[in-house]
Amino acid sequence: MARPKNVKHIFVTGGVISSLGKGILSASLGLLLKSRGLRVAIQKYDPYINVDPGTMSPYQHGEVYVTDDGAETDLDLGHYERFLDEPTSQACNLTMGRVYKSVIDKERRGEYLGGTVQVVPHVIDEIKEKMGDLAKNGSIDVLITEIGGTIGDIESLPFLEAMRQLKLELGEHNLLNIHLTFVPYIKAASELKTKPTQHSVKMLLETGIQPDILVCRSEKPLSREIKNKVGHFCNVHDLDVIGLNDCDTIYEVPLMLLKEQLDLRVMKKLGLKKFREPNLEYWKNFCEKVKHPKDGEITIGICGKYTEYPDAYKSIIESFIHAGASNDVRVLVKMLRAEDAEDPKFDISSAFKGISGLLVAPGFGDRGIEGKVRFVQYARENNIPFFGICLGMQCATIEFARNICDLPDANSTEFNKRTRFPVIDLMEHQKKVKEKGGTMRLGSYPCILKEGSKAHELYGKFLINERHRHRYEFNNQFRKLFEEKGMIFSGTSPNGDLVEIVELKNHRWFVAVQFHPELKSRVQKVHPLFDGFVHAAKEFAQGKRQLSLEVEMPRLSSTEMENAG
């Protein structure tokens, strides 16, 4: 198998427990290497048998991250893009399901010449072939591959075997393994315990892989003594034991790893020389704004269907961090369960207590829809900054149709196929689609903005490109009526057929979009819609505080005023 020359491979694995942050580690290392002038790409390998996460429940998988080319991928790709400010693609996320599907398709076409198809060599060879796809055009120096799951999981074994074989083929100076483990702190003993890390490395060794570098997550910093102990029992040099203790924000991780010299250890082992010193001043400034905002805090409510699991809204939450830093405030998120508002006895005004803005989040299905519509109505009627995304835009138009356009049972045909007023309907090209996976309107599409609109003011240009993931769209039969009643269709597809952005006149800030702007917000490039929304919420909060102060300030009598003078 021909492989591109001079491309260095870094594989990131995890042990002891899940959710240690392999994605953040991979993205942080990528940022450090990029800051030294290296061309870096990152990919994620997931061991589940699904072809992609597009049909998986948000409760199990979290957010589905959509790339420009329309791939439905793991949320870790969002971290890669936000940290490196580089687009990802379908090639950056491989699942075991895609591997097996490809192997079976080849068998059906007779490409194995009648042989018995087995995990070794056929599945392993398929994985190794995919491992080099991103490096084939010679446009990168380093390829970082994050392997999902935890060492010891049976599902990950084919990926690990492929990595083992690849290291033999490429040589130890062209491939290294970084193993992320957990060093728990036992409060009763006031000690950090290394035994779980030792056992995790032992399990990795059973697959034939000796880790080159250990990154140890812990509640408290690792002492030199602890690092020496880990290195001694795990057959790793103590300089290759990297401490990564808990921090206030994930955006501090690159700075912590820089201090621990992870990038230097990686470059030395891979024979990478003569690269510039990293300049992360902008990153340090961003972290300072996140940790110590000049103008305090504001609270924004996220009304959604999956509020018990914040990872379902990962990119939205991260976008609020970016926009908060841009506006010198810390954005606190209050999760608002849409289903709660479907109860007529629910006091919606109490839910808005302390909230300076409302975002109605994406989702699918009719559960909680009437609650979302009710939240939209309250924000519109009380002039509270409002931002709707995807389903949030659809709920905004349903609410407007019912309460402003006098279409009492207006709805989406997704929720009520017999509604008299289908203001949201299935897109024409979707009506013959039967399969669920990978069949929505996915990926980046152009949008034309209306001159003088809020959207045009925020973007500062007429043509934008945004990422989509939907089947339903605004029904143009109702466009004229909506415009007459005060709704502005400020963004459409280039041919004008598809509504992408709606706004309201005479409202402090009311913008709803069919696309997913949260997927394109970056540390250095906060998304203009989130930036504008947080700015409006900040002004709203400051206005409420000023009003509160005026109400609380005692009124002086004329005599008292004269005496004061």
Swiss-Prot record:
CTP binds at S18, D153, I154, E155, K193, T194, K195, P196, T197, Q198, K229. Pathway: Pyrimidine metabolism; CTP biosynthesis via de novo pathway; CTP from UDP: step 2/2. ATP binds at S19, L20, G21, K22, G23, I24, D76. One of its GO terms (molecular function) is glutaminase activity. L-glutamine binds at Y59, G363, L391, G392, M393, Q394, E414, R471. Its EC number is 6.3.4.2. This is CTP synthase. The gene is pyrG.
